[in-house]
Amino acid sequence: ILRGYASTLQKIYGPDDPLCAGLQGFMLINAAEIMRYTYQDNQYVKGWSEADTKSIEGMFRNVFLPVLTTFVQAKPYANGNWGGSVNKMVMAIGIFCNDEPLYNQAVDFFYNSRDNGSLPNYIAETGQLQESGRDQAHCMLGVGVLAELAECAWKKGDNLYAALDNRIMKGYEYLSK
């Protein structure tokens, strides 16, 4: 499936393309990570090869990243679950492609972006979420993508869970009330 997408997917388009690229892209990139490190090519089995990694990196850089970058560079216009989803995928591409500047861009967005998906804009000091007046489902999505992003960073040795006095935890506590 991943090889098929990497060889045919040329564009992600539509009014929700950043959200699609962030949410669905994250599932694909996680699957690619599993394939890359679990099913290695060997003399007995046609597993995941370096060529497969290069092909999928090309798809993430040339199809997904332009959509994500357009969103990141635009004036904020969406609820925070969009920005969080987009930024999580930017970070994941940075990790998968061993692109430290791209990873650092995602960390900077997490802390400093004007977008509603940055940590200080999505979760207030009280724990209230930017979408708390909307519905629980979108709040769960928004705080969930921030936690997934923090987990990706944790695997790299960066503790974003503790950011801004454990703001993600405060968001979960507020959400659970």
Stretch-by-stretch model annotation:
Residues 160-177:
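CBM-like carbohydrate-recognition segments
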